[in-house]
């Protein structure tokens, strides 16, 4: 998986300022491209036929101290179908102020995904206030899996 979905919260990352120039040549080395619909539509040529994992949530930017407070649906399952996405990615903030809302978003995406046969990738977000510990990842991955994420 080539994931280039970080710009929607971080802005341009060094080396990825021009995704249309940087990402397209890398596509042949990846099975799946994970990005927002805007990045896919504007940067991936129609001749590229990789599977797509559509970033389906939006979050607060890095300018906000607690990024988990901005979580919501950025693209619904019908948008994923129009984009011919093979899966959707839902970010969850375990331990953050927006945990409950992000988990509800995950559950709703799982329900919609099951209706249309589209799997849901549960993404664990480690924000500024969260530690990247084994305990955190064990809890986060277990919660996302038990709530129905197809993969984490």
Where does each model-flagged region fall?
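Alpha/beta enzyme core
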Residues: 1-47, 51-62, 66-152
């Amino acid at each position: 998986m080539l994931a280039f979905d970080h710009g929607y919260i971080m802005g341009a990352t060094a080396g990825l300022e021009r995704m249309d120039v940087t990402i397209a040549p890398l596509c042949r080395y990846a099975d799946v491209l994970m990005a927002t619909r805007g990045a896919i539509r504007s940067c991936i040529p129609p001749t590229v036929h990789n599977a797509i994992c559509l970033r389906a949530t939006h979050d607060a930017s890095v300018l906000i101290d607690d990024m988990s407070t901005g979580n919501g649906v950025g693209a619904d399952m019908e948008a994923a179908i129009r984009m011919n996405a093979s899966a959707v990615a839902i970010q969850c903030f375990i331990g953050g102020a927006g945990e409950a809302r992000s988990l509800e978003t995950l559950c709703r995406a799982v329900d919609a995904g099951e209706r249309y046969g589209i799997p849901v990738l549960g993404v664990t977000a480690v924000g500024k206030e969260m530690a990247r510990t084994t305990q955190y990842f064990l809890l986060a991955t277990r919660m996302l899996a038990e709530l129905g994420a197809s993969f984490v």
